[in-house]
Regions:
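Cytosolic regulatory regions of ion transport systems
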Residues: 1-203
């Protein structure tokens, strides 16, 4: 696949390296040339300096042949504009956008964005969305820590995340709702069929 990544922070650099190692053609765009140091010496993709909504720069990046674009800068406004340019101007088939402010979720949804929030696990989620067309929902376990996928039934619907954390003695780090993933506030009220990603210690 030919993939453009806009933003070379922690998520962007991790995503770029992961996709590049799997054999995909990767172009990374960032306004700060120093950000490319995060990619390391083994990155064999292309880097371009500039913003992700500059049409000429995007054409130089090869957006007209891109299979997917991941927009992962550190600003929601920049991400929205860059996403709309990729989708509306260049008709990129897959565009995945990072979200920081969960309060904007409804706006992002109305714009038709594929939004993902958070930090560490986000790059892997974006990679799965780009390469396989869906978000990962797998259980995993590392040492004493395990990640649990927990589906909300009607008995738990209406509770806040804080109340559920107390019940389960675990840490909720993401909520999947209508195939969108974001990092919510603890006072968020869950709905039936929400899926929680929970970090828990092995007992």
């Amino acid at each position: 696949m030919y993939i453009i990544i806009i933003g070379c922070g922690r998520v962007g650099s991790q995503l770029a390296n992961s996709l590049s190692m799997e054999g995909h053609n990767v172009v990374v765009i960032d306004e700060n040339s120093r950000a490319f140091k995060r990619l390391g010496a083994n990155f064999n993709g292309t880097t371009l300096i500039g913003n992700g909504y500059d049409k000429e720069l995007l054409q130089e990046a090869g957006i007209e042949k891109a299979d997917a674009v991941a927009v992962v800068t550190n600003g929601d406004n920049t991400n929205v504009v860059s996403t709309q340019v990729a989708r509306k101007v260049f008709n990129v088939p897959i565009v995945v956008t990072r979200i920081y402010d969960p309060k904007r979720e409804q706006l992002y949804r109305e714009l038709g964005l594929n939004v993902i929030g958070g930090t560490t696990v986000v790059a892997e989620m974006i990679k799965e969305k780009i390469t396989h067309g869906h978000f990962i929902h797998q259980l995993s376990e590392v040492g004493e820590i395990k990640i649990i996928e927990f589906k909300i039934d009607k008995n738990l619907a209406g509770l806040t995340l804080k109340e559920i954390e107390t019940k389960e003695q675990s840490k909720i780090f993401a909520v999947i709702r209508d195939k969108e993933i974001f990092f919510p506030e603890k006072e968020m009220i869950v709905k039936e069929k929400d899926i929680l990603l929970i970090v828990s210690k092995n007992r």
